[in-house]
Amino acid sequence: MTDRKNLTTNQGVPVGDNQNSMTAGRKGPTLIEDYVLIEKLAHFDRERVPERVVHARGAGAHGKFVTKKSMKKYTMAKFLQEEGTETEVFARFSTVIHGQHSPETLRDPRGFSVKFYTEEGNYDFVGNNLPVFFIRDAIKFPDVIHSLKPDPRTNIQDGNRYWDFFSLTPEATTMITYLFSDEGTPASYREIRGSSVHAFKWINEEGKTVYVKLRWVPKAGIVNLSTEQASQIQAKEFNHASRDLYEAIENGDYPEWDLYVQVLDPKDLDNFDFNPLDATKDWFEDVFPYEHVGTMTLDRNPDNIFAETESVGFNPGVLVRGMLPSEDRLLQGRLFSYSDTQRHRVGPNYLQLPINSPKAPVANNQRDGHMPFKQQTSSINYEPNSYDTEPKENLAFIEPEQEIRGDVAGRLIAEKPNNFGHAKEVWNRYSDAERAALVKNIVDDWSAVREDIKIRNLRNFYQVDPEFASRVAAGTGVNLEEHVADLK
């Protein structure tokens, strides 16, 4: 008898016939006692978990991060203390709005998330390729996503919906200037930049706090597609970015990104005409210089997309010692929402999955729940306790006290909204070709948008730069002058 691998049930019992169901005679009905059939169908019915409400379409890879410059003057995070320190990572890139099998050529921000498996526990970088977002407060997150998702009656994405929302949300204007540039249609995941979008706090061993933003810069350079190029690719292929990333790694052409930090002293927080902790505002490099931190190299593809790329969970609040979230209102909401969605999608024990499990030891009294596979055998499942063998809190790791800004609690309007100043900065920094692409992409997207919605958006664009509004209006046949007289 030859040595062969038997096909088995999930109970380990060898299967003799995987081609025919068990029936009552040659022409009779199928029997419910056919365990092989019932198990196979029942498992198939449950193969999928709910897709992510945002960032459903994604590709990922394993790799390493090497610290190139010590950050000890800013943070006590151990993996950033010494040059040459290597940290395992898993990175996931994604589109934001569209479903799991949608084309990767669609105009959309790109998610850029990295899980660092540090010796002090996991650290999640959760960002996008674009440096700002549509809104500044998490209470509006469901609304902006609903506007961009398909109409719940037709299941068709409708420009009238999201442009209506944008027109009444002037803080979104800077994001529009990025998203409707060609950077809204990147050529590949290997050629996108990454931004933390939010500011975070770094704390060093002396207790000094600074605000930081983080930036990833691809060594391959930033490469984008025109609308026409994206359409040509989409006619042939829905998966071009995932395929490009996978094949590059398989061929040994490992993608790399340099990580940079921008630093702001808290005493300078009020020295700007905008709030630096507002997610709709950028920290431009000439004002906040980049400092090189290290380099990420992705060198191994997942062995199982579902178990790794689909099951990985990120949260911007997953931080190691020496890092804290800032007071950014959008960030504050994400701290809850991101882990909550993984508990819904994957289950309460999603952190026990290998892709999410830290390399650092885990010791606590969080037990049981749906489908646990980590065995916790101690009879002591409470704390404090008098047993020296059980895990105890360590005051060395207590979070440092932080100053609270503001006088009263309440639903307060954001200070220094400056909704158009940064959009003007972006417009001024664009080349003639980049301005032309931005205008064309908006005009094309407005082909079926109602005129009243166009006018409200044009009024916003006019407050960015009259030329910007004038060029978009000319492309859409709107008489701009009669709608902006009160803005002059």
Q: Where on the chain are the PLM-derived regions?
A:
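Active-site-adjacent core segments of small-molecule enzymes
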Residues: 1-488
